[in-house]
C-alpha cells in the first residue's frame, strides 16, 4: 500500500507541474473540442439527470458550456458539494463512516442559479452553504444527511425541505423530480491523470470513487435489505491532452479505484470501454 501511495503521489506531483505550464489559450481550445464531443454522445442526449464537476479556471477542461447546454435541453443538473461529515449521518452511516469529508451531488435550480455561484479559493464556482437545505440530493431528499443529534433548524446539513419561495416551487413543479431519489444517468468527472485503459488518478481524496460506491449501494447502506443499490451511471471523464499518459504507461490503482466508461480528450480523442 505504501508503494502504491508513493507512486500516486509522485505521479500527481509530475502532472501538477505539467498542467501549471498549459496556457489559458490551450485550455480554452481543448475545452471547446472536448465539449463538442461530449454533447454529441448518445449517453448525453439520453441522460435526464446528470452531474457535472464545476471546473477550475486552469489546468482542466472547462464545463461551463456543458452546464449551459444541459439546461437548454431541460436536463436536471447536479454538482458536487463537499462538507465535513462529523458524526456518521443517520441515512448513510455505513457509507460515510470513517471519512471526515464527503461529496454529495446537489441540484442546480437553473442557469441563473449556476451563474450566481461565487468562486472558492481555487476559483471553482461553489454552492452557498445557506442554500444547501433547499437543493435536491440525487440520492433522495434535500441537502445533505443530518448528522446524529443535529436538527434541520440548527444545521445546514439537512435532508429536510426548507420552505421555498413561490418561484422555486413553480420551477420544481415543472421539473417534476422524484423526491425519493433515482440516482444519475451520467456523471461528468474530472481527474488529474488518465491512461488508455480508462484508469483515473484523482487529487487524492477519493471523493468520486467513494460517491460512486455509495450510489451503487444506496438503500443497502440505509438498512433496507430489499434494495440492491442504484443503477450505475455512465461515467465520462474529460481530460486535457497533457493529462493522458503516453501509451504503455499506467495509472497505479487499488481495488476500490473506479475506472471510467469513456474518456474524452481535448485533442479530439475519445476512449471507451468498448473500443
Give residue spans per PLM region:
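Surface-exposed, charge/polar-rich loops and edge strands
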Residues: 1-6, 10, 17-21, 125-199, ...
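N-terminal active-site beta-alpha-beta segment that forms phosphate/nucleotide-binding
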Residues: 2-175
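Non-catalytic alpha-helical scaffold/packing segments enriched in small hydrophobic residues
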Residues: 65, 207-210
Amino acid at each position: 500500500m505504501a508503494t502504491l501511495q508513493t507512486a500516486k503521489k509522485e505521479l500527481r506531483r509530475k502532472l501538477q507541474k505539467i498542467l501549471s505550464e498549459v496556457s489559458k489559450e490551450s485550455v480554452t481550445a481543448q475545452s471547446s473540442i472536448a465539449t463538442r464531443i461530449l454533447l454529441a454522445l448518445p449517453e448525453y442526449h439520453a441522460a435526464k439527470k446528470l452531474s457535472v464537476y464545476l471546473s477550475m479556471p486552469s489546468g482542466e477542461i472547462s464545463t461551463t458550456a456543458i452546464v449551459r447546454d444541459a439546461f437548454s435541453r431541460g436536463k436536471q443538473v447536479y454538482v458536487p458539494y463537499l462538507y465535513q461529515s462529523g458524526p456518521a449521518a443517520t441515512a448513510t452511516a455505513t457509507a460515510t463512516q470513517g471519512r471526515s469529508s464527503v461529496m454529495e451531488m446537489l441540484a442546480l435550480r437553473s442557469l441563473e442559479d449556476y451563474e450566481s455561484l461565487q468562486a472558492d479559493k481555487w476559483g471553482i464556482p461553489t454552492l452557498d452553504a445557506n442554500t444547501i437545505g433547499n437543493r435536491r440530493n440525487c440520492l433522495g431528499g434535500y441537502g445533505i444527511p443530518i448528522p446524529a443529534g443535529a436538527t434541520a433548524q440548527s444545521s445546514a446539513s439537512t435532508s429536510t425541505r426548507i420552505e421555498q419561495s413561490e418561484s422555486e416551487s413553480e420551477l420544481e413543479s415543472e421539473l417534476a423530480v422524484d423526491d425519493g431519489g433515482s440516482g444519475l444517468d451520467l456523471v461528468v468527472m474530472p481527474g488529474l491523470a488518465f491512461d488508455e485503459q480508462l484508469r483515473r488518478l484523482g487529487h487524492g481524496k477519493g471523493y468520486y470513487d467513494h460517491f460512486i460506491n455509495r450510489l451503487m449501494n444506496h438503500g443497502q447502506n440505509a438498512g433496507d435489505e430489499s434494495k440492491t443499490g442504484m443503477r450505475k451511471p455512465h461515467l465520462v471523464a474529460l481530460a486535457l491532452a497533457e493529462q493522458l499518459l503516453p501509451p504503455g504507461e499506467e495509472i497505479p490503482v487499488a481495488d476500490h479505484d473506479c475506472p471510467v466508461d469513456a474518456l474524452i480528450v481535448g485533442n479530439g480523442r475519445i476512449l471507451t470501454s468498448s473500443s
